[in-house]
Regions:
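A short beta-to-alpha transition loop/helix N-cap that caps and shapes the active-site region
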Residues: 117-123
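Short, conserved beta-strand element in jelly-roll/cupin
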Residues: 43-47, 56-73, 112-114
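Short, compositionally biased
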Residues: 103-107, 111
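Short acidic-glycine-tyrosine-enriched beta hairpin
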Residues: 77-93
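A generic "binding-loop/recognition-motif" signal
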Residues: 50, 59, 70, 79, ...
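A short, N-terminal "cap"/entry segment at the start of jelly-roll beta-barrel domains
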Residues: 1-39, 53, 124-135
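Short beta-strand His + acidic residue motifs that chelate non-heme Fe in jelly-roll/DSBH
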Residues: 53-55, 73-74, 91, 97-104
Length: 135
């Protein structure tokens, strides 16, 4: 991690890795890392054939951006739609949703929560394994 004026530069080697049975997430910007409190920003990897169960984020909006891989996105309990690289999904606060990797490779996503908060709750999910920074 490197300070740059009042900003911060982080890499995945600088932050915790939170692992689940469906994949992993690393938050490159969150209150505990960069002091940002209006949003958190993370990189998600969904394992082949896996995804996270239907859930919501009370009080926080979410944007998901697909970097690579193919999947299905459900929002508001509507039938899931196919998503792939370049897709951006906006999810209003409190709305139930899920993402499943349906492709033949790891699905990489960027997630942003506003305001920050869901990143703390993810660490408390039963079965979550938090690995300290590698760097």
């Amino acid at each position: 991690m490197q300070k740059l004026g009042s900003g911060v530069i982080t890499t995945t080697h600088d932050v915790d890795c939170v692992e689940f049975d469906w994949g992993k997430i690393q938050f490159l910007s969150e209150p505990a890392v960069t002091d940002a409190d209006r949003f958190s920003f993370g990189v998600v990897e969904l394992s082949q054939g896996k995804g996270h169960a239907r859930h919501n984020h009370p009080g926080s909006e979410e944007v998901i951006y697909v970097i690579s891989g193919e999947g299905e996105q459900m929002v508001d309990d509507k039938p899931p739609v196919k998503v792939g690289p370049g897709a951006s999904i906006y999810i209003p606060a409190d709305v139930y949703h899920s993402t499943v990797n349906t492709g033949g490779e790891t699905m990489k996503l960027i997630v942003v929560y506003s305001p920050a908060g869901p990143e703390r709750l993810l660490r408390e999910i039963p079965g979550a394994k938090v690995t300290p920074p590698a760097g």
